[in-house]
Amino acid sequence: MQTGLPRQRAGFTLVEMLIVVAMIGILAAIALPRINLSRLRSKGAIQGLGTTMLAFQREAIGRQHNMVIMVDVPGRALRALYDSTNDVRINNNERVRIIPVGEEIVFGKPAAVPARSFGANPVNFTTTELSTGLPAMVLYRNGSAKEFGGLYLSTAKAMAGAPGHANETWAMELVRATGRAEWLRWNGTAWVRGF
């Protein structure tokens, strides 16, 4: 015969678990609308493009031929031409890679944001790829760029002037001597370097 205190069960009841799940749902319903997903998406897209530009510069040096990066504004993408003939034209035997800029990201800047020294247009390069007519950046095989220029990237909400989205505008400046793409972010009052 067993005597003593009854054994207590470890664990949670179904009712307790349902209460916890309901509380998590209520908190999520309150918090999720306040998360700025477009800011996170824009930062992710810019970091991805920054890394891609660095890789293209290294590719030009490593393969010892020009890299032509075309800016397709309507298609919201960059097109990279591995220009083995160094003629700034797509030929049959040359590889072209398309890099989308990201969800909700567009080329351009809101009218209220001041322009950088390279100009106010969404894309400010005078070189064009000869077969498509798209504005292009040319990275030479020594790592330098053909010209100084830049482009602006922004979220659709920032372009529309939505409140709370003014700091979702970015500028990329291509330095001619080094071929380095420098990134700047509009913080609402000034351009600041970095991601």
Positions of PLM-derived features:
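N-terminal helix-rich module
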Residues: 2-21, 25-51, 58, 66, ...
